[in-house]
């Protein structure tokens, strides 16, 4: 897993996020080192859905970390509407995007990623629900009121409801991609 790989290549005057072609050249160098050892690269990045970074990763032949799934499942379970979750699953299939999907991780529950797939009001509702259950909003790069993720275990985010957790896990396991089970979910 290559955390925040898109920030690695730096150039004066550039955005310094997914600089192209530098990011892909760096990944190719790492891949050449890793392949003789049978290692696969898993580029990890948080970015809004609307940026389509996951598509760029897939176009380069890499598996991508699915940071959309955790929030989409919570949204579906809390709203009773799985339209966005089903749409995401169909997009993975239609575009042949290979993912490792997860529910929880050491970073908490990613929400910045949902911009462009869920309306801002729905994202805010998710934030409010998770915060009401003990979650803590982590702002983007220390900027106030620009959310990045909510720090909470997935079980806590679901209100410690065992039925919701079981359904969330089943959805994760049967989603396109390889499920990653985190020990603190």
Please annotate each region the language model reported.
Residues 1-185:
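Active-site and adjacent substrate-binding regions of carbohydrate-active enzymes
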